[in-house]
Every structure is written in structure tokens, then in C-alpha cells.
């Protein structure tokens, strides 16, 4: 093999080789498909089988999966446009810490890109033989430089490439069916340069701007060490090794080469060169092979031996292949595939190659690390290089469906491209505990909590709402608090409804921790911005926190006052009393407008001092009903501040609520339940008002969401809040043990994002809701999830199992939900 770089010129997404071939290159947008969804995976493979059948006549192909830079710092910089001004320092610090901690754990932060190259059919291009000969003659005598001798060469190249525009346009339309997009000229430059700087330090932007072949190939490649190549660039040096695919199982189904390679604990490349075999070669070769196998079987039988199992299997496969290639669309494809690993030392590189071989062996794929063919493989895998008749070693022969089984351009991406770190993808593998699941993953998850209604390209939803469900103790509240911590850094007004009244307790412990105060002052200063409201009627400071007179505008205040009082007093048939009540309400609201310190309790006082005895008695009754009850939260004299709508971060604690069961009839409500329902109306109105400012983004977290689903009033409140979310920039985080709490028929499309922790009694419903197939394997997968693991369905409709992790030790105290006792640590200590 002549070891020469095939590339001669680049024009847009086209590459011209020394031999006069023109290749077109496309980036294939990856698809995230859970491997547990067998039907979706098979459907995807069928689509690629049909693609290869459609483009078989193009003859030569190049599949490439490579680890591109994730550019996390750049993504966090873009995220800063959403950060609140008063949280910029703390957000920037934690984003920098995220980058540092992830790089410490993973090394280079990468994501896999997928490139498909196709050699264009020159037979379809109208180029005079003389022009092509002139160009090839020029290339054979001229320097390798594309730009230095720009004058004539560039002009010829451009006119030459223009001849291919029509045939490339046809191919580009076919590529669109698998989400393929043309590479730009700078991307083409980088894809070629990448092969010479793989695993070495380099700046993608700088390498993409190179304009001549000599600079693109400006790396010393030293093949003197067996099994590896030593690469020296102008910035760095390192080692690469090409691990070649040698054998598959007879049945290649579910070999999933490209997908399997992604789950390795370090970044790798997968390169595959494919060439269509002419049927005029395939048919005689199969006939000859079949004849040989027949003679082998005859010979074995003549000596009294049974036919070898391998001989019988081979004969069956040959017969099957002969039947298959009778179909017009089916061809044999010859292909050569390698996994490329990198390392700073030869030892590291060979060690990674060994791990690759062991890992793929588990998927039924046998690999080899060639000792003396590393340089040949390096040049064979360059863009524009094709297989030829001299390539005999490690060539695989399959039909198009065999190539499709490699599962090109599928990954396990989930979440958003810009956002905060939330955890790790778990590719549905079995682990001993949560920590091992986290440590075995390279796929980290970013999440931006407020993107769904931003008209994202490719998004499957316009709903900003989020559902977090699962059994008690699996991590719902932990996840909700983690997201709330991140949201508190965004320029979003946030409200967390905390019925267990636990957040303040844990946060206060963090604020009182001398070590954290001394070492993490930015985080302490941020936590001190949290505003707490406690709905506890036993605390006099909370009286009037939800008084409509205090926090609502006049019209809405009057309406809500009526609703609250009607919960505990029947005005029907008592027009005089009702008139006095309404008049007193108007007078108190007018007084409030004039700046006087008044509240709903003043309505009762006015009724008590009314000249009519019936009104006085009604006032006395209402006073007794309100006295020492939960209604003190809604009915007070205005001396305490109401819930603040001005604070950016509010935690609203709810205590001592006595709400009826959702199936209970209204006439069976106890007086205590009626009072709690009245408070629910007030709470809902506050949330509704909270989310109704179109000039600002707002979010509410509703922990223990049974509060809103146990009464008709609560359901009404919650539905109204969600409608506000669709109309305004408002998102609701609904945190509940039961998926059924949230997923009524009319509500199923109302949640754009969902996190589902395991709930043994609802696995089937959860799988359906999360776009997962309801199978035994998937139910078992849910059963085996650890505390802190959940299914995550994102804005794009993708679903994956993820392990939640908070990277920052100082945050853990504020995210706690239970106190771990000494005996629990002792339990874990013993083998």
C-alpha cells in the first residue's frame, strides 16, 4: 500500500483525492434511543438498512464516530445570559467547579459526533476526460499545497467541483432521511486534520482554519514501536493504537458496535470503510464456496464421520446468502472497521486497547491489536481513502442489514445542551450500587429547567411543567431541591411549597456550619437570600400571611374573601347578613387602599358592631370560627406582612392542614376540612398571582402534591396554575408519590419534562408515560433502580435512566430529607 494522504483539495463538503475521486461528507445528527425499547431499535436499524440499499450503487463509504470537544466552559458562558445579576458570582463559581470536577474524573470532556462519507458516482458527472486528466496530471506533478499556488489550481478545482453539484444534491436529499447535514468547509478541514492530532492537545477552531494540505498533515508519525503509533504535533505528542474488528458471531443481531464503543470508560473512535461488492464477483465466489463445503461434507461422510457443525452452519449461511442476493436491492458489502484509542504513553495506549478487546468480547465481537499494521491502518482510515483489492486482512462480508446492525449514530443523550449538571446516564446496565453506576458512566446530564416553551428546534413539547414521581425515599425531594438550588441562580422568581416544613431546618444547619461559612462564603451568601413563609396558624407571626386584603388587588381580594367566608358560613337565604358582609368587605378594602392597616378580621369586627342583631350574631359566630384555627392564616388584622410577591426566592411552608380525601363528598367535609380548604383557595390564588406577571419568569415547586389532589378545590387550583403556565412564563414542578395524582386524561400532555423514580404499584403506567415499552425487562430494570436513580424524559421526548448526583459537598446538607443515624453507618461498615 502506498502510504500517501489521499486528500488533494476541499470545496464545501466535497473532498477530491489524488486518484480523482470526489467524496461528499455529512454530519449525522445522533438519535437517543433506549436499548430497552427493542421495537424502536429495530425500526432504526431497518431505516439504515434501507439507506444502505438506496446508496449501494455509490460503492464506497466511510463511517466515522469520533470524540469531539464538549466545550463545557463555553456552554456555561452561554448559560450566564439566564443567570440572575445577584447570583452571577455564585453561579460562575459553581459552573467552574463543575468543569474542574468533571475533568478531574473524566479527563477530556467529549461528546461523540457521527460523520458519513460517500464517494460520488463520477459516471453521473459530465466531465470531459481531458479536463480530468489535466487535473490529475497537475496533482501528480505539483506540490501538495492547495492554497500556496492558488491562482490556477483553485480556479480549476472550483469549476471541477461545480460539475458534482447536481449529483451531490441528490445524495444530500437522501442523507436528510437519516438526519444528515452537509459539513462546512472548515468542518471538512478539521475532520481531515483530526486524524493527525487525535488524542493530542489542540484547538478545534485553529485546526479548522488551516488552508493547505501540508499543514493539515503536519504531524510526525513514528511507527517504530510495535502495536502503536507515536504522534508528534507542533503542540503535543502521544500514542494511538488501531484495534481492528476481526470476528462477529454468526448472527450479528444486536452487535451494536458504535453504541457499545460509547460505553467504554474513555473516549475512543470507531472508523469503518465499506465497499460494495459487485454481484458478478459475489455469485461465483458463493458457488465456489458452496461446492467446497459440499465436497467437505462428502469426504466426512465417506470416512464415516458426521458432518462438522461448522461446515453445516457455513453451508446454511451460504444458502441463505445466495437466496438473499437474488433480491435486486441486496448486495454484499466488504468492510474494515477499527476502534482507535489514545494515550500519553505506550503503556496507557496498549492498556486501553486491552480494555476495548475485553469489553467488545462481551458483545460477541472479537478484536485484535495488530503489531505491524498500525501505519497501514492509519492511512486506510483517512477521509477519501477506499478499500481496494489488496485489502484482504480483517475484511468483514455482510449484506446491508449487517452494516445497519452496527447501530451508527445512536447514543444515550438526554437533557439539554446548555444547563446545570444533574447526574449521569446509566445505559441500563447492572451495578452493585449507585456509586458504581455513577463511576462507570462518561455520559453526564445537563438540564435547563426553563426551556420547553422557548420553541426549541426538535422539541416534542411546549409545556414548561415538570413531573417528579416515585415511591417514598427514592430521591424525589432530593432531586427537586437540587433543581431548586440551580433555579435559584437563574433570573427566575421561584416558589417552593414545602408542606413538611423541612427545607428551612436543613438550610439553617448549613448556615450555622462554621466550616461551610468559612470555606464557601458565596454559597452561604446565596442561601441567606432565601425568603421563608410558614403557613402555621399556631405561630402568631404567620397570622394573615394569606389574607386576601393584604396581598391581592381589590377586585380579586373581594372575590377571594367571599369564597373563604362561604366555606365556613352559609349565607343562603340571609340577604341582610350577606349585604352587611359585602358592605363591610368593601369598606375594609377601601381603607386598605387609603393606606390603613386593616385585614379580613376587620370585616368581622364591622359585622360585630353592626346595628342589626342578626349581623352582630353572624359576626360573633365567624369570630369564634376563626379564633385559634387555621383560618388565622387568611383572616387577620393586617398587622403582619402578607406573603411577598417581590422576593425572587421564596420557600412556603405548610403545616397542620386537614384536607379531605379527594373522593369525599362536599357535604361530608368536617369544619376543620372546610377551613383547610379555604386556606387552599388562598394558597392557590397566591400561586396563580405569583405566576401571572408576563414580564418575568416564575416557577413553583409543589412538594407532597397530594395537598392539591385530595380536594376538588385543590384540583381546581392546580389546574388553574397549569393554565397560567401555558399562558405566561410560568413553570410548575409537581412532586408526588403517585403518577396517577398528576396524569389525568385531560392532563397527560401538560408536563413537558418528567422524572420517574420507581413506584412498585405503578410500573406499567410509568413506563407508558415515559415512552418506554411495557416489557418484563423494563419492569425488571425499574425494580433494580437504586435510591437516586430515575427515568428522565426530556423536552425532546427522549428517555433514559439516570443517576442523580450533586457534585458539591457543601450542598448536601441543604438537600437532605432524613438524618442518617450512627447505627446506619455501622450497618454499612461490616461485610
From Swiss-Prot:
Q: Which GO terms describe its molecular function?
A: ATP binding
Q: Which SUPFAM superfamilies match?
A: P-loop containing nucleoside triphosphate hydrolases
Q: Where is this region: Disordered?
A: 285-311
GO cellular component, as recorded: cell pole
**GO process terms (BP):** unidirectional conjugation
Keyword annotations of the record: ATP-binding, Nucleotide-binding
Which positions does UniProt annotate for ATP binding?
A: 470-477
Q: Which Pfam families match?
A: AAA_10
Q: What is this protein called?
A: Uncharacterized protein YddE
Species: Bacillus subtilis (strain 168)
Amino acid at each position: 500500500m502506498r502510504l500517501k494522504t489521499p486528500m488533494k483539495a476541499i470545496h464545501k463538503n466535497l473532498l477530491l483525492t489524488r486518484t480523482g475521486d470526489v467524496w461528499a461528507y455529512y454530519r449525522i445528527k445522533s438519535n437517543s434511543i433506549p436499548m430497552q425499547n427493542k421495537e424502536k431499535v429495530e425500526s432504526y436499524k431497518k431505516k439504515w438498512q434501507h439507506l444502505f440499499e438506496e446508496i449501494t450503487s455509490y460503492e464506497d463509504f466511510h463511517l466515522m464516530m469520533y470524540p469531539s470537544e464538549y466545550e463545557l466552559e463555553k456552554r456555561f458562558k452561554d448559560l450566564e445570559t439566564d443567570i440572575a445579576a445577584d447570583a452571577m458570582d455564585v453561579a460562575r463559581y459553581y459552573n467552574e467547579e463543575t468543569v474542574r470536577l468533571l475533568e478531574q474524573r473524566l479527563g477530556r470532556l467529549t461528546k461523540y459526533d457521527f460523520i458519513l462519507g460517500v464517494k460520488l458516482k463520477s459516471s453521473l458527472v459530465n466531465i470531459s476526460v481531458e479536463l480530468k486528466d489535466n487535473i490529475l496530471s497537475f496533482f501528480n506533478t505539483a506540490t501538495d499545497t492547495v492554497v500556496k499556488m492558488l491562482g490556477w489550481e483553485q480556479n480549476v478545482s472550483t469549476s471541477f467541483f461545480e460539475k458534482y453539484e447536481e449529483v451531490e444534491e441528490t445524495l444530500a436529499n437522501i442523507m436528510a432521511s437519516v438526519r444528515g447535514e452537509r459539513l462546512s468547509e472548515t468542518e471538512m478541514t478539521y475532520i481531515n486534520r483530526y486524524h493527525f492530532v487525535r488524542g493530542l492537545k489542540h484547538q478545534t477552531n485553529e485546526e479548522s482554519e488551516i488552508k493547505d494540505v501540508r499543514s493539515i498533515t503536519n504531524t510526525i508519525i513514528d511507527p517504530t514501536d510495535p502495536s502503536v503509533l507515536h504522534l508528534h504535533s507542533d503542540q503535543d505528542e502521544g500514542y494511538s493504537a488501531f484495534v481492528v474488528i476481526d470476528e462477529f458471531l454468526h448472527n450479528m443481531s444486536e452487535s451494536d458496535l458504535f453504541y457499545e464503543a460509547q460505553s467504554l470508560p474513555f473516549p475512543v473512535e470507531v472508523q469503518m470503510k465499506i465497499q460494495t461488492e459487485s454481484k458478478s464477483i459475489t455469485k461465483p465466489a458463493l458457488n465456489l464456496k458452496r461446492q467446497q463445503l459440499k465436497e467437505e461434507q462428502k469426504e466426512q461422510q465417506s470416512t464415516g464421520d458426521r458432518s462438522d457443525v461448522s461446515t453445516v452452519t457455513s453451508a446454511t449461511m451460504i444458502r441463505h446468502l445466495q437466496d438473499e442476493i437474488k433480491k435486486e436491492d441486496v448486495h454484499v458489502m466488504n468492510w474494515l472497521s477499527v476502534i482507535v484509542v489514545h494515550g500519553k504513553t505506550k503503556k496507557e495506549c496498549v492498556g486501553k486497547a486491552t480494555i476495548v478487546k475485553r469489553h467488545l468480547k462481551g458483545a460477541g465481537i472479537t478484536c485484535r491489536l495488530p503489531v505491524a499494521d498500525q501505519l497501514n491502518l492509519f492511512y486506510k482510515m483517512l477521509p477519501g481513502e477506499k478499500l481496494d483489492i489488496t485489502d484482504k486482512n480483517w475484511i468483514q462480508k455482510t449484506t446491508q442489514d449487517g452494516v445497519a446492525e452496527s447501530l451508527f449514530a445512536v447514543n444515550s443523550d438526554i437533557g439539554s445542551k446548555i444547563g446545570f449538571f444533574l447526574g449521569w446516564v446509566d445505559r441500563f446496565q447492572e451495578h452493585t450500587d449507585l456509586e458504581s453506576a455513577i463511576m462507570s458512566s462518561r455520559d453526564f446530564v445537563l438540564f435547563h429547567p426553563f426551556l420547553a416553551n422557548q420553541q426549541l428546534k426538535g422539541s416534542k413539547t411546549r409545556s414548561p411543567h415538570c413531573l417528579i414521581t416515585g415511591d417514598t425515599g427514592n430521591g424525589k425531594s432530593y432531586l427537586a431541591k437540587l433543581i431548586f438550588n440551580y433555579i435559584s441562580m437563574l433570573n427566575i422568581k421561584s416558589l417552593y411549597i414545602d408542606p413538611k416544613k423541612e427545607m428551612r431546618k436543613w438550610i439553617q444547619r448549613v448556615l450555622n456550619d462554621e466550616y461551610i461559612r468559612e470555606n464557601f462564603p458565596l454559597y452561604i451568601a446565596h442561601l441567606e437570600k432565601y425568603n421563608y413563609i410558614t403557613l402555621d396558624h399556631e405561630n402568631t407571626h404567620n397570622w394573615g400571611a394569606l389574607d386576601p386584603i393584604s396581598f391581592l388587588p381589590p377586585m380579586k381580594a373581594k372575590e377571594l374573601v367571599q369564597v373563604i367566608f362561604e366555606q365556613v358560613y352559609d349565607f343562603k337565604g340571609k340577604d341582610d347578613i350577606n349585604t352587611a358582609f359585602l358592605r363591610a368587605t368593601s369598606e375594609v378594602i377601601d381603607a386598605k387602599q387609603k393606606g390603613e392597616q386593616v385585614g379580613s378580621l376587620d370585616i368581622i369586627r364591622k359585622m360585630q358592631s353592626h346595628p342589626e342583631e342578626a349581623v352582630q350574631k353572624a359576626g360573633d359566630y365567624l369570630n369564634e370560627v376563626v379564633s385559634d384555627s387555621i383560618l388565622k392564616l387568611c383572616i387577620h388584622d393586617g398587622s403582619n406582612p402578607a406573603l411577598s410577591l417581590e422576593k425572587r426566592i421564596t420557600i412556603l411552608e405548610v403545616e397542620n392542614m386537614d384536607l379531605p380525601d379527594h373522593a369525599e363528598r362536599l357535604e361530608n367535609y368536617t369544619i376543620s376540612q372546610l377551613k383547610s380548604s379555604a386556606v387552599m383557595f388562598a394558597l392557590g390564588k397566591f400561586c396563580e398571582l405569583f405566576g401571572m406577571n408576563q414580564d418575568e419568569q416564575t416557577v413553583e415547586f409543589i412538594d407532597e402534591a397530594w395537598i392539591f389532589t385530595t380536594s376538588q378545590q385543590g384540583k381546581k387550583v392546580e389546574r388553574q396554575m397549569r393554565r397560567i403556565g401555558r399562558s405566561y412564563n410560568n413553570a410548575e414542578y409537581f412532586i408526588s408519590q403517585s403518577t396517577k395524582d398528576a396524569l389525568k386524561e385531560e392532563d397527560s400532555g401538560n408536563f413537558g419534562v418528567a422524572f420517574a423514580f420507581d413506584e412498585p404499584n405503578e410500573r406499567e403506567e410509568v413506563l407508558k408515560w415515559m415512552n418506554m415499552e411495557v416489557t418484563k425487562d423494563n419492569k425488571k430494570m425499574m425494580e433494580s433502580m437504586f435510591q437516586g436513580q430515575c427515568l428522565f424524559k426530556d423536552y425532546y421526548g427522549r428517555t433514559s435512566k439516570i443517576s442523580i448526583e450533586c457534585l458539591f459537598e457543601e450542598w448536601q446538607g441543604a438537600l437532605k430529607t432524613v438524618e442518617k443515624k450512627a447505627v446506619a453507618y455501622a450497618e454499612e461498615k461490616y461485610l
